[in-house]
Amino acid sequence: MSFTFAIIGRPNVGKSTLFNRLVGQKLALVDDTPGVTRDRREGEGRLGDLEFTIIDTAGLDEGAKGSLTARMQQQTETAIELADALMFVFDARAGLTPNDRAFADFARRANKPVVLVANKSEGKAGEIGAMESYALGLGDPVQISAEHGEGLSELYDALRALMPEPDVELEDDEEIDGLTEEDFSKRPIRVAIVGRPNAGKSTFINRLLGEDRLLTSPEAGTTRDSIAVEVNWKGRDFRIFDTAGLRRRSRIEEKLEKLSVADALRAVRFAEVVVLMMDSQNRFEEQDLRIADLIEREGRALVIAVNKWDLVERQGGQIAQLRTDADHWLPQIKGVPIVATSGMLGEGVDRMMEAIQDAYAVWNTRVPTAALNRWFEQAVAQNPPPAVAGRRLKLNYVTQTKARPPSFVVFCSRADAVPQSYLRYLVNSLRGVFELPGTPVRIMLREKANPFAHKRKRKS
């Protein structure tokens, strides 16, 4: 009989989206309205070489006896009884709610193995919410985006640990990451090209395609929708989204333009690498910096293209100056790749595609555990954390929780007392030692559990 997982959690946290992702087809209706799933649905799930039965359940919620909500809950309880293990899903962007905490207790009482799944983990809000979930006592959260297919290699590891050994072993040249995340070497890299209006985004993509596929005009705002085009460059597939220009909010007046901007922001969230295209005549303006900050908050790899370079009077050292300017204006993502381009003349196309591919590789970085531990010991020894109110802060150890972007948790004695300046020191040191330019690096703090805390409570 197939190993069975039940997906449980409160309404509208993405259970059906995860179910559809694992089953490989849209068997479950997905909508933003809580309670869309009313029955339990079963399907044959697959993740890499893992095969299992998966049950999608209604959102756990209290309801009057005999009501539709109560019957939905009964279906969920039946699914839990049938399952060998549970996937407890919560919305990391929303953070933990009282219902999440109540039904985490419910999951524990089921006396089944539980995989804690932090869905919608994109961006800083999602990562903070994921770290919150340690309080549930269900182990390490697996950070994913069911909608975008991110974090599946981490989910694979968590499911693999609970399942019996497969009858057939993987061949030596098959890698888990390739299997579980749709084979990175074959799946197109998703790239969004964003920037202020009339920066030359569509002209550049037309040059890349070798045809006038996208409408261009000197008038700002020609592109209204996010348009996706498929590009094969030197044997590697890319899916590139041309987006509407992003103006300051106060200058967005027409309803259609508001929708276009919302579409561009969605493209950023869906992308893996984002190219911020600037006009060489007006670079690093306030709106450029706002867009770059958005890209960093969403956890996407960043490449800066300074377009219309043909209009710049050529002098030595200009590219080096651009890099200096970028590090000055964007200290949160030091070392971001910068490419000078001319969409009109076709200059810089190859350099841009190489930069995108390199940024994607950095974004997917996993640091070997031994090297990470060596770095941590040296970084703390060279610059110990400051004492707070006369008490020394102790940093115990570090672990990488995920890639895409590289994210780490530092276990320490007092998480709330570690200054932001020291956290920035760790991020910059980590970025420099492991060569992680131009991609967000997340370091979260978590207090190490005190094994004597319960004894003190018992005495008091």
From Swiss-Prot:
All residue ranges annotated as the KH-like domain in the record: 365-449
EngA-type G domain: residues covered: 3-167, 189-364
UniProt keyword terms in alphabetical order: GTP-binding, Nucleotide-binding, Repeat, Ribosome biogenesis
Binding positions (GTP 2): 195-202, 242-246, 307-310
Pfam assignment, any one: KH_dom-like
Transmembrane segments: none
The keyword Zinc appears for this protein: no
GO terms for biological process, alphabetical: ribosome biogenesis
Sequence positions that bind GTP 1: 9-16, 56-60, 119-122
Gene Ontology terms for molecular function: GTP binding
Source organism, top-level taxon: Bacteria
Role according to the record: GTPase that plays an essential role in the late steps of ribosome biogenesis.
Similarity comment: Belongs to the TRAFAC class TrmE-Era-EngA-EngB-Septin-like GTPase superfamily. EngA (Der) GTPase family.
Subunit-structure text: Associates with the 50S ribosomal subunit.
Designated name of the protein: GTPase Der
Organism expressing this protein natively: Rhodopseudomonas palustris (strain BisB5)
Lineage: Bacteria, Pseudomonadati, Pseudomonadota, Alphaproteobacteria, Hyphomicrobiales
Gene: der
